[in-house]
């Protein structure tokens, strides 16, 4: 298995393309100059394209991924109705979802042969929209509205339109600020990191009709932490055993173990990391975690070790200015 790591640096308008070997070492393959401040990225389900959100001219860009080394070639672009904060796709590679914090909306763009071709629809009124997350069954889109302390639930129609479910939303505790999410591999649980109080909520998917319930809320900060809380990103290992979330003020990654059924998280430790970690990701083997320091202008590679999933630093690498997003592709 070959793996490529992509890092987005908006201040220098660059994507760095890295090869990740089995020992956790990165080798630079390419530096791509992007026509705009690159914000958020996602790899297509068939692993052939990288979709990138840019500003100040709000667009989604599509880059072809070379099958031999992961290098990028520009392929297409499509306009967006707001500054892209988070980008994702459905599991069949038919649609791109873009959440916009500043515009307070989520948009759907149709893909044809892997390329963005037209805007299907926009849902407004999502104050502080920070991500769009399709459920494993490809039926429901979860959209956290950070400023409203709610997660909105939409059914994805066959033609890409979003229809509010019943109930249409679930609420977090006041002042939590739901931000990013991941789903457990068993499809029964989801985990949401809350930006404003640096907590993680565990949501149980109770039935196929979209009914969900919060079954646990866990503080992700050390007991003696007294500064402003500012959580950012969250990811789970492919085997569902370990979960990680980062806080930008503390510049740390919190390590969680996950119960066998996915219902319970336990804090295992705290890993100091690059300054102001805005984004990170986990490789497809579940062996390495790559974190980006928005203020250090570096990325760091950690090995995930032991039964607790603690992190051991393997190396750090200079990237562009203000790196904020990391994605990993395996092929």
Swiss-Prot record:
Keywords: Carbohydrate metabolism, Glucose metabolism, Hydrolase
InterPro entries recorded: 6-phosphogluconolactonase_YbhE (IPR022528), Cycloisomerase_2 (IPR050282), Lactonase_7-beta_prop (IPR019405), N2O_reductase_N (IPR011045), WD40/YVTN_repeat-like_dom_sf (IPR015943)
Pathway: Carbohydrate degradation; pentose phosphate pathway; D-ribulose 5-phosphate from D-glucose 6-phosphate (oxidative stage): step 2/3
Enzyme class: hydrolase
Pfam families recorded: Lactonase
Cellular component GO terms, alphabetical: cytosol
Gene3D superfamilies according to UniProt: YVTN repeat-like/Quinoprotein amine dehydrogenase
Gene Ontology process terms (BP): glucose metabolic process; pentose-phosphate shunt, oxidative branch
GO terms for MF: 6-phosphogluconolactonase activity
EC number: 3.1.1.31
Catalytic activity: 6-phospho-D-glucono-1,5-lactone + H2O = 6-phospho-D-gluconate + H(+)
Sequence similarity: Belongs to the cycloisomerase 2 family.
Stated role: Catalyzes the hydrolysis of 6-phosphogluconolactone to 6-phosphogluconate.
Name listed for the protein in its UniProt record: 6-phosphogluconolactonase
Organism: Salmonella gallinarum (strain 287/91 / NCTC 13346)
High-level lineage: Bacteria, Pseudomonadati, Pseudomonadota, Gammaproteobacteria, Enterobacterales
Gene giving rise to this polypeptide: pgl
């Amino acid at each position: 298995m070959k793996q490529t790591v992509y890092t987005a640096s908006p201040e220098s308008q660059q994507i760095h393309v890295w090869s990740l070997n089995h020992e956790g070492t990165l080798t630079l393959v390419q530096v791509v100059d992007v026509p705009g401040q690159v914000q958020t990225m996602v790899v297509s389900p068939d692993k052939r394209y990288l979709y990138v959100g840019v500003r100040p001219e709000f667009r989604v860009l599509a880059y072809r991924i070379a099958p031999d080394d992961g290098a990028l070639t520009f392929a297409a672009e499509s306009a967006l109705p707001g500054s892209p904060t988070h980008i994702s796709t459905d599991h069949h590679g038919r649609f791109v979802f873009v959440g916009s914090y500043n515009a307070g909306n989520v948009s759907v763009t149709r893909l044809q042969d892997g390329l963005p071709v037209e805007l299907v629809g926009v849902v407004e009124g999502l104050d502080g929209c920070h991500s769009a997350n399709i459920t494993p069954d490809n039926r429901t889109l979860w959209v956290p509205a950070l400023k409203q302390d709610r997660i909105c639930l939409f059914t994805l129609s066959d033609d890409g339109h979003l229809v509010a479910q019943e109930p249409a939303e679930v609420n977090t505790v006041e002042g939590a600020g739901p931000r990013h999410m991941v789903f457990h591999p068993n499809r029964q649980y989801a985990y949401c990191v809350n930006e404003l109080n640096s907590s993680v909520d565990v949501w149980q998917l109770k039935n196929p009709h979209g009914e969900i319930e919060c079954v646990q809320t866990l503080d992700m900060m050390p007991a003696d932490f007294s500064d402003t809380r500012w959580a950012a990103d969250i990811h789970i290992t492919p085997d569902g055993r370990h979960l990680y979330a980062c806080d930008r003020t503390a510049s740390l990654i919190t390590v969680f173990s996950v119960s066998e059924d996915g219902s319970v998280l336990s804090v295992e430790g705290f890993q100091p990391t690059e300054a102001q970690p805005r984004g990170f990701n986990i490789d497809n083997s579940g062996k390495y975690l790559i974190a980006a320091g928005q203020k250090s202008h570096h990325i760091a590679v950690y090995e995930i070790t032991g039964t607790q999933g603690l992190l051991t630093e393997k190396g750090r690498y200079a990237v562009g200015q203000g790196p904020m997003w990391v994605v990993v592709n395996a092929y």
